[in-house]
Structure formats: structure tokens, C-alpha cells
Amino acid sequence: MKRVDRNLTKEILFGGLRWYKKIYWILQHTAKKRDLKTVSPQVRAALILGTYQIFYMDRIPDRAAVNESVEYVRFKSEAGAVPFVNGILRQIARRAEYFTKPDKKNKPVEYLALQYSHPDWLVKRWLDRFKFERMETMLEANNQPPPVFIRVNGAKTTPMDLQESLLRDEQTHSEKGNLKGCLILKKHPDMSPEGLFARGFYTIQDQASQLISYLVNLQPEATIVDAAAGPGGKLTHMCEMGQGKIKLIAVEKSGPQMERARQTATRLGHDTNIEWVFSDFMDYTPKDKVDRVLLDAPCTGLGVLRRHPEGKWQKAESGIKELAEQQKKLIEHALKMLKPGGEMIYSVCSFETDETESQMRWVKSTYGDQVEVVSPVSRLPDYFKRYVTRENVLMIYAGNQDDMDGFGAFIIRWKGAP
């Protein structure tokens, strides 16, 4: 499949997932008495993806969206459903979005959940924290494809030189991000073996994720444990920032993720001074106490729904509490590894209170004088200090002004037993 076809296919599939709830609502109103749950998954998929193209992709003519969806159904040996699919999609193509929606004022949860295609439980949860207007911004942001942030490999090039190379060699325009060494590509990168990516001139990493390495105080001779090293973004960023003067212990329990991290490190030329440990973090204990632990903890991923739209429909509210308990165990294990004066940097791709601020408060209440909260303000570039809360937690919400992923992070210094 050509790159342009692959990108278009991904856009349609992800779009169908992002707008699933609203599309299903439109389809069910159009189908009227026919319950869509009774049709085959193939027919349902054709209807959803066809409707997405009609409503959200201006560059695809409605006629083409209808015809391709019908041919897909025919190809999947669902010939009997062809008239049904053809009829439904043609009705949708002829009409504007005219069905009566829930009232915005009296039923804000139902309105937002439908208008922006999010599960009701998540909208209700967030509406308890955020104002209606901000909610609209956040939910809309979750439905937009993320920008392509890249991290320039300073060992091989400079941002300016890479911008010139991208334009000259790959006809890719880019602009500078607000973080040193960060660029934003204007189209999908060239992933071919001879491309600049494959040759290690840059790696793909959201700007919010790049910020986390700034929180790790990378002093010379420091030993740092990366508790979940795959796929290698933060690991290799620390390698570059440490300039070969730090020792990294990369812990990863997933074989494929470990391999990805190794490949990323090799591709970027940052594969020295790394000790690779194939293990669950909870089963790993270093020989000696360490200076830093970067705990990029398992989380709900509610800050990266624009990257993983299927997550909206796969997650349940009960899972937040369960993950929070798991995170506490990982935090306890991480703190045991630290020398006096050592630091744990905790991060998640979520802005849920249970996974961020509440975790920091729990650490303080549990360990008292044995720990100290270090403000991220002391580590971050000036521009990004605006994202630090009064409680000294880095909190990046969906729909932020810099179009970054949602993230949360804090720093705990281990003072030792009193």
C-alpha cells in the first residue's frame, strides 16, 4: 500500500472511532425501525466509515464514499445488505444533520457526549471538574488528529539543518516547537529505509512527553532507572541530554517494547551506557541504590485519546481506581531504590486527579518527613512553567494552547528514614 493510501486509510479508521457515538446515533435515526445491532459487523463498519467520510471528509465526494462502502459490503459477501447500505448512506448524503439533539442547558452531559462523541461517564466525570466551555475545547481536541511532533537528534544535526534537509530531501515543511530541539511536521514523516527518520536524524515524540526528561536531574555520573523503557522515547532523550555522562538502566517487561527501545537507541546512536533489564519493574531490584527512577506508570491514557480513540469505548470508570492502586505499589517500589537525596520522577499520560495530584498527596501523607516534593518549575524551560500547579504537579490538559498530549508528572526527593 502506498504511503498516501495508508495515511488515508488510517484517517478514515481513526475518524470512525473518534466519532463513533455520534455516527451511530445518526445511523440509527436514519435506519429508524432497523436496529443496527442486528446487522453484521462488516455491514455496521461500512455504515460507520461511510458516514464518517460523508460528514467529516470534504475531500472525498459523497458519491465516492457511498460507492466504496457498498463495494466493501459486496466484497465481504454481504450482497443481500447492499441495498440497505446504499439506501442508508444515500439518505445521509442528501440530508444535513437535522435530528433533534439533547438540550444543551438541561441535559449538558447527554449533549456533550453526543455532540463530541464521548462516553457519558467520562463527560460527567470531567464536567464535575471543568466548565462547559472548557469541556467543549477538550472534547473537540480529542477528536482531532494530533500534530506530528519530532525530537531532533542533537548528536547528528541541528533543528535548522534538519528543517532544511526535510524540505530538500522529503518535501516536508516543518516549524519549530516551543521546546528546544522540537519540530512540528506538516505531514506524515517518510518512514522509508533511506529517509531521515531511519537514518537517526530525529524521532517522533510528543512535546509533552519530551518535557518529562527535563524533570530528571541528569547530573554527571548519576545512575537512572527507567522503569518502563519501551518504546524508548524518554530513554533516548535522557541519553542525549546526559551526553554520555550518566548510566541508564532500562527496565521493560514486554519483549516487543524492549526490542523497540533497543532499535530506537541504536537508530539514534544512543545505545551506549544503557544496561538492559528484561523484567517486570516490580520484580526488579538494582544491586545498589540509584540516583533517579523515572516511573512512567501504567495509566488510563485519558490524556492521549486523540491518538487512541478506541480507548474512549474500551475503558470504564471503575478502571481508574484500579490503576491508581497499581500505581501506588509501583511508587512504593521505586522509592525503595533511591539513595538519600535521590529522586523519583512520576509521569502518566493522563490528567485524572486520581492518577496525578492525589498520588502526590498520598506519597506525602504516607512518607511524611522521609520525602520532599520538588517543584517542576525548577527544571522546566521558562515557557512551560505555566503548566505547573500550585501543588507542584505538571498538569497538561487536553485542548491546551500548545496542542500537546495530556500529561501529569511530579518529582519526589527521597530524604531517607528519619
Give the location of each predicted region:
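S-adenosylmethionine
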Residues: M1-P418
